[in-house]
Amino acid sequence: MKQLFGKFACLMLLVMACCVVAPVSAMAGTGVDNFKITSGIDTRKSSEITFDATRVISGTAEKGAKIGITVYEPYTVNGKTYYKLIRTYNITVGSTGIFSQSISLKEGANYLVVAARKDGKYSEIRTTINRKDKVLKSVLSQSIA
C-alpha cells in the first residue's frame, strides 16, 4: 500500500511540475460594470488542469457588453514565449446580465483571455488551462483503484 501511495504521490508531483504558470489577471479601473467569471475558470488560481475536451465559461457583465473568449497555444522560440491563435468565441450579454459559452480545449496548454467591452470600457481575465491526455488519466485511475 505504501509503495502504491508513493507512486501516486510521485505522479501527482510530475503532473503539477508540468503545469504552465500564467497568472490569472484582471484589468481594473475603467472596467466593464459587473464583469465577473462565475464558473469555468477559477480566478483564484494561476492555472488549472483538466482531462476534459471542453469547458463552459460563464459570468456576468452589464447588458450589451461584448464578451470575447480567445484561446491561444503558447510556444517558445529561443527562450521567448509566443501565442498562436487557436479560436475566438464572441457573445453579447443579454438583459439578464449573464453569459455562458462552451469552448474547446486542445491537449496541452490553452492560454485563455476572456475580455469584456462596452462604451469604451474594457476588462479582461487571463489564465492557462492545461488539458492532459487520456493515457495519464488512465494511469491515475489505475493508481487510485
Residue ranges and their predicted role:
Residues 2-10, 26-145:
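Ser/Thr-rich low-complexity repeats and stalk/linker segments
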